[in-house]
Design a protein with these regions (language model features):
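Amphipathic alpha-helical packing segments from all-alpha helical-bundle domains
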Residues: 92-96, 103, 112-141, 150-157
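N-terminal intrinsically disordered/low-complexity leader segments
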Residues: 1-6, 144-146, 193-207
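Helix-turn-helix
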Residues: 10, 14-52, 56
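Helical hydrophobic small-molecule/effector-binding pocket
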Residues: 80-106, 122, 164, 168-171, ...
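Hydrophobic alpha-helical connector segments
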Residues: 56, 70-96, 152-156
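Short, charged helix-capping/linker segments at alpha-helix termini
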Residues: 25-26, 142-150
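Short, basic, alpha-helical segments at the C-terminal edge of helix-turn-helix-like DNA-binding modules
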Residues: 59-65
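Conserved NTP phosphate-binding and transfer environment spanning the P-loop NTPase/kinase superfamily
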Residues: 172, 180-189
Length: 207
């Protein structure tokens, strides 16, 4: 007889595993219940709709991709280095999947798309805040340049959008990194400042 209760985090872990292996569009409450050996009703206790389950898997993706490696920042890390790390973490998380994550999301029905949008908003805002924190704390940045189109409020969403575009297209972000180096830092004899000016370490902070 199936177990009737299960920890919510374990449910999300199993759902994420199914989505990574078969695609998020293949995920269903019944499939999750069967994989966990529990009654379907036990899943509905935590996720009343498939859209709720899809949103939880989406949040799990960002949690795995970002929070452990990218959410803690320190004053010794340049903005461009942090952007590289962010792009690398997202790319690594996608590479671990057996399916095209973005193509799968496009196949979802409208109700699940709306749930994803609702879940994505706060996460993107959190990522933009992290980018702004690192940008403003980078002592090598020429801060007088952070105005107009290069203001943190405009630059960070642009950087994040470019990262996601590169992930969807399967391209690298080297042009973005080069533009950031040229736009934000003073050139020095052996390279741009972002690669040659060392900042004194500050206390670790959560973004």
């Amino acid at each position: 007889m199936p177990k009737q209760v299960i920890d919510k985090d374990k449910l999300v872990d199993q759902a994420y595993s199914i989505a990574a292996r078969e695609g998020i569009s293949a995920l269903s409450v019944r499939k999750l219940a069967a994989a966990c050996g529990i009654a379907v009703g036990s899943v509905y206790m935590y996720f009343p709709t498939k859209a709720d389950l899809t949103a939880a898997v989406f949040r799990r993706f960002f949690g795995q991709a970002l929070f452990e490696e990218c959410c803690r920042v320190d004053g010794s890390e340049s903005f461009v280095d942090y952007v590289r790390k962010l792009r690398g973490a997202l790319g690594e998380a996608l590479a671990q999947m057996d399916v095209d994550w973005f193509a799968e999301m496009r196949r979802l029905p409208r109700s699940e798309h709306e749930a994803l949008e609702a879940a994505r908003g706060p996460m993107l805002a959190h990522m933009e805040q992290g980018l702004q924190h690192v940008l403003e704390a980078d002592p090598a940045v020429v801060h007088s340049r952070l105005v107009g189109a290069l203001s943190p409020e405009k630059l960070c969403p642009f950087v994040l959008g470019t990262i996601f575009t590169s992930l969807m297209e399967g391209s690298d972000c080297e042009p973005l990194f080069a533009l950031l180096d040229a736009s934000l830092y003073e050139a020095v004899a052996d390279g741009v400042a972002s690669g040659s000016v060392a900042a004194a370490p500050d206390e670790m902070k959560d973004c």
